[in-house]
Amino acid sequence: MDFPSRFEVIVIGGGHAGTEAALASARMGAKTLLLTHNVETLGAMSCNPAIGGIGKSHLVKEIDALGGAMAMATDLGGIQFRVLNSRKGPAVRATRAQADRILYKAAVREILENQPNLWIFQQAADDLIVEQEQVRGVVTQMGLRFFADSVVLTTGTFLGGLIHIGLQNFSGGRAGDPPSIALAHRLRELPLRVGRLKTGTPPRIDGKSVDFSVMTEQPGDTPIPVMSFMGNKEQHPRQVSCWITHTNARTHEIIAANLDRSPMYSAAGEIEGIGPRYCPSIEDKIHRFADKESHQVFIEPEGLTTHELYPNGISTSLPFDVQLQIVQSIRGMENAHIVRPGYAIEYDYFDPRDLKYSLETKVIGGLFFAGQINGTTGYEEAGAQGLLAGANAALRAKGKEAWCPRRDEAYIGVLVDDLITLGTQEPYRMFTSRAEYRLILREDNADLRLTEKGRELGLVDDARWAAFCKKRESIELEEQRLKSTWVRPGTQQGDAIAEKFGTPLTHEYNLLNLLSRPEIDYAGLVEVTGLGAEDPQVAEQVEIKTKYAGYIDRQQDEIARLRASEDTKLPVDIDYTNISGLSKEIQSKLGATRPETLGQASRIPGVTPAAISLLMIHLKKRGAGRQLEQSA
């Protein structure tokens, strides 16, 4: 039997975006080919050994709710789990896990290799086959031709990748891997806007040379959280601690004295790409925050079978001799041995405003982009885009309509809408602050928001669907039980509740009413009554929905009011220069972005509410005119 050459979907790249894209496409029944330059690096964590965090865990849980692999791999490879913002409201709580690089990568590869409809092949893609503004396939580095009408590009930092250490630079996709030069040249021939971005990574440290006794220990949470809705803590390997230390005045002096040897700050200006605002290099921190006497450094283990450590907070592209001085100036690392030097990497990205909501390019039919090629940073952002692009590539291959969640439905929707509407001039990172409807888009209810849609699309398997339906039913039953259970003052149970919570009952209440009070919690009610949900996820949902019901209802009302105009489609052939009343500037902005809906148009910087009103009037006139033409 020959190796097949025709597929429905081809995915280029085996990182976090590529693996989720390939899995999503294959889960939906599309014959899918995943091309990777090295099978051994499928699912590799190129930078920090962690998944989740503020805003990011929301994306991971949404990927999971849609059947993706990231959360499951994290549960299988996670060596420390914590809930961030645990004392704050549920909208901003976020799960974060340190991961063993080897275990995480192995989990991703096992999921890939056991996925039906998915072929994995080790070859770099050097060229795209494009005919009449439609992608038809790819050509690999050894001239093999694979054909598909949907191709997903998830190239990470490999497009024209250039690694910098001090004033020296060399080509690379990441340390130890070659860049994609031929494919970068091919993409620059397409009518797409292209730019350069930069990211960086710190030197890795040998843990045997570190004195942990002078650092602050940071253990994981107890009880241990899980990342996947299908996960359990028994899946976790051995749990370990992280450690915290700080830079100091000596560290800052070393950096300041050597800025002229930095590729970012030297007179030569070796790096032209813009780096991530929210994950700056240590030289950036010293330059931008000169008044700060120290910066935190989180010492994170790379895995259970290695002594290698990741010093989170000192990403740098300074020369190796300076890196060594920096590391050894930090408390606890005076005798530290560097295993791998830190570096910065520049790479090509393409303006995401040239994409549709489906992540398909506007100019080449069937060509989808996901991950860092769209200007984002982070495993979670990449995985979310990959899943969406892979799903839409499969939908297109089957002749079905594309799908993207709205801003009020998912952080994935916020991410995509921000990218294709606003574009980005620097690596884009997700935060909860980017979402208008944070209380509805919590990490804990991602499955309740998305799993039903995932099942409809073919992304969710039978086991996940059965577990979801059971959970949803259990929530409804528990709410009904609380609503129908009444407590009277003066009874044994009423007195027990009053004593437990310091809240005398003035009249008869049902348990749901009592739970809505800020001083009463679900666990306390269970303790007093002896009854409650066994599943902690069910208990959590019941408590959050009850306590925040008023706020949630207000957000839902606001969403309903805005939805009509939000979803109003703008014609593909609309000519903004013919709409009277629009300024030249706004005509230009609308023409450049080509928004798909009124809602997207309203979020373009500089497009005023008055301009949106003019667009609505134009659409009504256009609709009335077409009705007259049809009646004639």
Swiss-Prot record:
Residues binding NAD(+): 275-289
Q: InterPro entries given for it?
A: FAD/NAD-bd_sf, GIDA_C_N, MnmG, MnmG-rel, MnmG-rel_CS, MnmG_C, MnmG_C_subdom, MnmG_C_subdom_sf
Gene3D superfamilies to which the protein is assigned, alphabetical: FAD/NAD(P)-binding domain, GidA associated domain, C-terminal subdomain, tRNA uridine 5-carboxymethylaminomethyl modification enzyme MnmG/GidA
Quote any Pfam family the record assigns. GIDA
Q: Which GO terms describe its molecular function?
A: flavin adenine dinucleotide binding
UniProt subcellular location: Cytoplasm
Chain sites annotated for binding FAD: 13-18
A GO cellular component entry from the record:
cytosol
Q: Which domain of life is it from?
A: Bacteria
SUPFAM superfamilies associated with the record: FAD/NAD(P)-binding domain
Cofactor(s) demanded:
FAD
Which BP terms does GO give this entry? tRNA methylation; tRNA wobble uridine modification
Q: Which UniProt keywords apply?
A: Cytoplasm, FAD, Flavoprotein, NAD, tRNA processing
Q: Which family does it belong to?
A: Belongs to the MnmG family.
Q: What does this protein do?
A: NAD-binding protein involved in the addition of a carboxymethylaminomethyl (cmnm) group at the wobble position (U34) of certain tRNAs, forming tRNA-cmnm(5)s(2)U34.
PANTHER family found in the cross-reference section = GLUCOSE INHIBITED DIVISION PROTEIN A, PROTEIN MTO1 HOMOLOG, MITOCHONDRIAL
Q: How does this polypeptide assemble, per the annotation?
A: Homodimer. Heterotetramer of two MnmE and two MnmG subunits.
- What is the protein name stated in its UniProt record? tRNA uridine 5-carboxymethylaminomethyl modification enzyme MnmG
Q: Which organism is it from?
A: Pseudomonas fluorescens (strain Pf0-1)
